[in-house]
Amino acid sequence: MLSITILFLLIAEGSSQNYTGNPVICLGHHAVSNGTMVKTLTDDQVEVVTAQELVESQHLPELCPSPLRLVDGQTCDIVNGALGSPGCNHLNGAEWDVFIERPTAVDTCYPFDVPDYQSLRSILANNGKFEFIVEKFQWNTVKQNGKSGACKRANENDFFTNLNWLTKSDGNAYPLQNLTKVNNGDYARLYIWGVHHPSTDTEQTNLYENNPGRVTVSTKTSQTSVVPNIGSRPWVRGQSGRISFYWTIVEPGDIIVFNTIGNLIAPRGHYKLNSQKKSTILNTAVPIGSCVSKCHTDRGSITTTKPFQNISRISIGDCPKYVKQGSLKLATGMRNIPEKATRGLFGAIAGFIENGWQGLIDGWYGFRHQNAEGTGTAADLKSTQAAIDQINGKLNRLIEKTNEKYHQIEKEFEQVEGRIQDLEKYVEDTKIDLWSYNAELLVALENQHTIDVTDSEMDKLFERVRRQLRENAEDKGNGCFEIFHQCDNNCIESIRNGTYDHDIYRDEAINNRFQIQGVKLTQGYKDIILWISFSISCFLLVALLLAFILWACQNGNIRCQICI
């Protein structure tokens, strides 16, 4: 927020012995030797006294764990954390605003795939918590708690913590399983379950007896039925088989039915879904530090009050809008017209029409004067404050127009959804183009308004002084007035503060004006008289020449012959 402390500065210079002419008072505005270029609606390069950068280009090389809660998945992605893979125990009961997935995350259990991976990932991320509720499932005449050498814990064969691998009983039986669970709670439940795909028919019968197997999971509104796809696949962690994981959401009052004759990877419970939570996920290698920031990107955290940033299009939290421009400057001061280097303070006194004043440090507008008591400079409180009041809060208003608590994450799609991904990227690129254009236009509008306001206040101040002085002074055309009466420092002060009474000095001013005009004419009158004098001189010269010729002819000194 722009704030300027207005102080009246009066610098007395010289003495009455150094100046004997008429008092002069000039109006001017602040200037600096090197201003800042900004863009307006009508000009790409306008120099102003001060401007503020609106685009943040700096970021912290770390993620800030406050005030947003961050959970580092480390070697586990969010899906492995939900399944309960080895090495993911640190995620049990974890709660987050932003789940940090690392590019180095790896699978550590039986090789698997999730046909609707991104949807499951999004549901888990948005939920903001791993709140797993264990349930009792009555499976009949089958073996439970199957394990695999691909899933080691403490060098022992194991399996996903939150899943139960069902196989045939010791009596080689895998009878039809038909199990129903009712959601009698007040929240939605997320069940994650799987289907095992053996690599051979022999493995199928050795594990489940029945070939083919089948898994069907139903609710009142949906049904998913899967027949295992038996076949050899590349070996991963010593396994050629695969598990496909699916998920089902059961709303309050709904039921879920598990029906299988083999190959079911059964849930041990469900995840409690929080419909009010609005968490998200960020894939980045940036470490978590000890800083404080409400905005995170895949390149690090941003701590700024600026409304725009060009660090990353992937941002989470209370972040500036991403724009393509590297710089957008908001004018917070008036148009800058630097003072000529060769001009002293009063070497050739001039007002705002010719240039600005670099010595006017305590205000935007002010006065310079020269009289019998010396010279001086003073800032004008009223006009400066009027301009500040209109500009003050401009940055805050601009932030309000652009600030929105939102997150923009990089969306991922399966390979079969390539066209959707291309369309999504096109839409995101279009949104960024529009925001970049809107940001540039908005800043240009604000800059135009700022310059117009400051120019207007200068004109208002000049008009106020002109109305005060009236015929007691003459406008010199450069922002200065020559005063035709004695005007000491008190008189000058009355002009500045608006208490000047022209009637007091009127007679003296008129008398002095007539005396001065008898000797000293303004530049406009000089030009007219010079032209008249030149014309008369030419006329007299021609008349004398003709008179001489006539006289000479009469005396016989000149003979004229006209031949036809």
From Swiss-Prot:
One of its GO terms (biological process) is fusion of virus membrane with host plasma membrane. Glycans are attached at residues 18, 34, 178, 310, 497. Residues 1-16 form the signal peptide. It is found in: Virion membrane; Host apical cell membrane. GO terms for cellular component: host cell plasma membrane; membrane; viral envelope; virion membrane. Residues 17-527 are extracellular. The chain crosses the membrane at residues 528-548. It is a single-pass type I membrane protein. Palmitoylated. Keywords: Clathrin- and caveolin-independent endocytosis of virus by host, Clathrin-mediated endocytosis of virus by host, Disulfide bond, Fusion of virus membrane with host endosomal membrane, Fusion of virus membrane with host membrane, Glycoprotein, Hemagglutinin, Host cell membrane, Host membrane, Host-virus interaction, Lipoprotein, Membrane, Palmitate, Signal, Transmembrane, Transmembrane helix, Viral attachment to host cell, Viral envelope protein, Viral penetration into host cytoplasm, Virion, Virus endocytosis by host, Virus entry into host cell. One of its GO terms (molecular function) is host cell surface receptor binding. Disulfide bonds join 26-480, 64-291, 76-88, 109-151, 295-319, 487-491. Gene3D superfamilies: 3.90.20.10, 3.90.209.20. Belongs to the influenza viruses hemagglutinin family. Binds to sialic acid-containing receptors on the cell surface, bringing about the attachment of the virus particle to the cell. This attachment induces virion internalization of about two third of the virus particles through clathrin-dependent endocytosis and about one third through a clathrin- and caveolin-independent pathway. Plays a major role in the determination of host range restriction and virulence. Class I viral fusion protein. Homotrimer of disulfide-linked HA1-HA2. Major glycoprotein, comprises over 80% of the envelope proteins present in virus particle. This is Hemagglutinin. It comes from Influenza A virus (strain A/Chicken/Alabama/1/1975 H4N8). The gene is HA.
